[in-house]
Amino acid sequence: MAIHGIFFGSDTGNTENIAKMIQKQLGKDVADVHDIAKSSKEDLEAYDILLLGIPTWYYGEAQCDWDDFFPTLEEIDFNGKLVALFGCGDQEDYAEYFCDALGTIRDIIEPRGATIDADWPTAGYHFQASKGLADDDHFVGLAIDEDRHPELTADRVEKWVKQISEELHLDEILNA
């Protein structure tokens, strides 16, 4: 088993593809990828470092598999766990709800002890509002728009993986 658990929910395949891009950059021996629809509480508890991928649907709704998993997520003690979030949204058609699900999942795991890191700058995005903001200038995690700007995805993922590797001290953990 790898030391990082990447968990995603996806209806269209976009968030799954992002999860696999992240795994490829980190290394398959370092990160396991799991579909949240096929995951259990014990699957998440097995990792000290979690990367959680959640897309936002329509008017700020969480993807259905995550929505179904939220009661289980509420049972997990996240104390001692490092968490980085990533998510997909549509900043044009749903500009007032862009990546809201990032905020939804943060609001579930943060009170349960999760240390959430890896904020991502809002610069370069064009949206009206988001519950997925850490502050006025940052999302709580990586925000991806595969609907409007798929050409930016690979570069954003690469930069974010480098960022989380530094912020979560992944090199130190791997070499310990």
From Swiss-Prot:
Q: Which UniProt keywords apply?
A: Electron transport, Flavoprotein, FMN, Transport
Q: What is this protein called?
A: Flavodoxin 1
Write down the superkingdom of origin: Bacteria
Q: What PANTHER family does the annotation carry?
A: FLAVODOXIN 1, FLAVODOXIN 2
Organism whose genome encodes this protein:
Shigella flexneri
Molecular function (Gene Ontology), one example: FMN binding
Ranges where the Flavodoxin-like domain occurs = 4-165
List membrane-spanning regions: none
What is stated as this protein's family in its record? Belongs to the flavodoxin family.
Q: Which Pfam families match?
A: Flavodoxin_1
Note the InterPro entries from the entry.
Flavodoxin, Flavodoxin/NO_synth, Flavodoxin_CS, Flavodoxin_lc, Flavoprotein-like_sf
Q: Could you tell me what this protein does? A: Low-potential electron donor to a number of redox enzymes.
Question: What lineage is this protein's organism placed in?
Answer: Bacteria, Pseudomonadati, Pseudomonadota, Gammaproteobacteria, Enterobacterales
The cofactor named in the record is: FMN
